[in-house]
């Protein structure tokens, strides 16, 4: 019995497929972080013609003069969340947050430090990794006036650990999906103004862990003709809700204290 011969085109495609599989396997073996960084990315290439909302949907920020405090008003907070109107509450965080608590969480869970899906950025030359951040937490490196550190995790293990300290707020509907993406922003007391990163889902929660910062909600490009900017001073344990399709948040130094600012960001659908 003679072996069946494949047509030349099919043979060429088969060879190309084998070569591509071998090439990708080599990349995965020698550059595992290349795949882990993009594994959880929902969109690698954005559509420049896509607009999530139009001007008619910007009514939650029209004529808004201030960010209202809805502490203790559960029903009102739920209504504001459904409409996308920004507000702040000061009774949603159950435990007293502090720099020491965050240090304890990071040191007590090795899996967070070994998470290859996390992102870490720092303007401090001596604090270029999460491990260096822990080791220099009380050193002079974090006593400078102006610096910015950004740490973002996107793993199930990290979300499970952080959920114990930052549980789902009472005004977030139980049938909503909470993103795995969690971010920390650490700023020196004189760190200049900067735009906060866009959260995974539109409904965004920002918790002030320690220190103070002024958060200015500028209207997004879609709502710039309908809305104006509003600001709020964030103090420890304050939780701010906003919709990132309606508002573009900026973090501004408050100049009220010499302590660094630590903020925690999450989002839900």
Feature map (PLM): residue ranges:
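N-terminal accessory scaffold of Fe(II)-dependent oxygenases
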Residues: 1-241, 245-269
């Amino acid at each position: 019995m003679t072996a069946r011969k494949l047509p030349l085109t099919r043979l060429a495609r088969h060879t190309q497929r084998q070569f591509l599989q071998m090439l990708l396997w080599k990349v995965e073996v020698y550059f595992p972080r290349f795949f882990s960084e993009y594994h959880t990315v929902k969109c690698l290439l954005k559509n420049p013609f896509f607009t999530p909302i139009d001007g008619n949907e910007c009514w939650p920020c029209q004529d808004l003069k201030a960010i209202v405090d809805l502490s203790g008003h559960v029903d009102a907070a739920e209504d504001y969340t459904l409409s996308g109107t920004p507000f702040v509450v000061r009774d949603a965080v159950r435990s007293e947050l502090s720099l020491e608590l965050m240090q304890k969480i990071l040191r007590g869970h090795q899996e967070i430090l070994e998470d290859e899906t996390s992102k870490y950025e720092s303007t401090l030359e001596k604090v270029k990794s999460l491990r260096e951040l822990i080791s220099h937490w009380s050193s002079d490196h974090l006593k400078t006036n102006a610096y910015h550190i950004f740490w973002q995790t996107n793993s199930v293990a990290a979300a499970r650990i952080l959920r114990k300290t930052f549980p789902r707020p009472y005004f977030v509907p139980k049938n909503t999906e909470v993103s795995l993406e969690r971010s920390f922003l650490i700023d020196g007391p004189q760190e200049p103004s900067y735009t906060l990163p866009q959260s995974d889902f539109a409904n965004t929660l920002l918790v002030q862990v320690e220190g103070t910062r002024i958060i200015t909600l500028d209207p997004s490009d879609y709502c710039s003709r309908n809305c104006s900017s509003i600001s709020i001073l964030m103090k420890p344990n304050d939780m701010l809700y906003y919709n990132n399709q309606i508002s573009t948040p900026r973090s501004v130094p408050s100049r009220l204290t010499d302590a660094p600012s630590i903020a925690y960001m999450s989002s839900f659908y």
